[in-house]
Amino acid sequence: MRGGVGTTTITAALAWSLQMLGENVLVVDACPDNLLRLSFNVDFTHRQGWARAMLDGQDWRDAGLRYTSQLDLLPFGQLSIEEQENPQHWQTRLSDICSGLQQLKASGRYQWILIDLPRDASQITHQLLSLCDHSLAIVNVDANCHIRLHQQALPDGAHILINDFRIGSQVQDDIYQLWLQSQRRLLPMLIHRDEAMAECLAAKQPVGEYRSDALAAEEILTLANWCLLNYSGLKTPVGSAS
């Protein structure tokens, strides 16, 4: 929906919760910011990733990292300053990742492939989104997201997940009540504001690993169970659309 709503943190947290429920999970960073790795204790100086490998003519599969016996991570990789400023020069060279992920899906090695997608409208983002059997649009309950819900198209069939909900905020409560009446794809659970969500990135861990007793961690676990009940009839992957 927009940057800063917590998509990357929730992607990491959902991946952790699904593997805690016994699922085999691959979490893929499709954002050039390359931040997802920092939620899985990867060194800041680690430059490798699937996109970096493709741009350097290397095998993208070698960029995968093991976090737990049931959770693997595929970072994006670090771009140079010039690459960051000129994405049109390299984005078209990344399309092979789509066939690679399709092969992984068909292999059955992972029951869930979570893709942290950027909010841009690039070709590679659209290609990756088209691979996803399901998508979650992460929103904050504020006027900004309310406006965007009416002027930005969501992916077909996307569900809307509220993050950073503040108890006691009158404007949030008003907007939330409006959404309950108007947003038919709103998920039946939400993620409340929790300091643990801010702390976990500093600790370089998913929130459920950092503080399993935190309210947000319990709510993400509820989300994971909901995904199992509603998305996993054929063990299909979930994508997160920002």
Curated annotation (Swiss-Prot):
Alphabetical UniProt keywords: ATP-binding, Nucleotide-binding
SUPFAM superfamilies: P-loop containing nucleoside triphosphate hydrolases
Molecular functions per Gene Ontology: ATP binding; ATP hydrolysis activity
UniProt xrefs under InterPro entries: Cellulose_synthase_operon_BcsQ, P-loop_NTPase, ParA/MinD_ATPase
Pfam families membership: CBP_BcsQ (PF06564)
Top-level lineage group: Bacteria
Factors inducing expression: Part of the yhjR-bcsQABZC operon.
Annotated binding of ATP, by residue: 1-8
UniProt keyword Nucleotide-binding, yes or no: yes
Cellular-component GO terms for this entry: cytoplasmic side of plasma membrane; cytosol
Main function: A C-terminal pseudogene fragment of BcsQ, which has a premature stop codon at position 6 of the intact protein. The mutation prevents cellulose synthesis, and has polar effects on transcription of downstream gene bcsA and probably also bcsB, bcsZ and bcsC. When the reading frame is restored cellulose biosynthesis is also restored, see (AC P0DP92) for an intact protein. May play a role in subcellular localization of an active cellulose biosynthesis apparatus at the bacterial cell pole.
Other comment: Cellulose production is abolished in E.coli K12 /MG1655 and W3110 due to a premature stop codon in this gene. The sequence given here starts on a GTG codon 6 nucleotides downstream of the premature stop codon.
NCBIfam families in the record: cellulose_yhjQ, PRK10037.1
Protein family (similarity comment): Belongs to the BcsQ family.
Protein name: Putative cellulose biosynthesis protein BcsQ
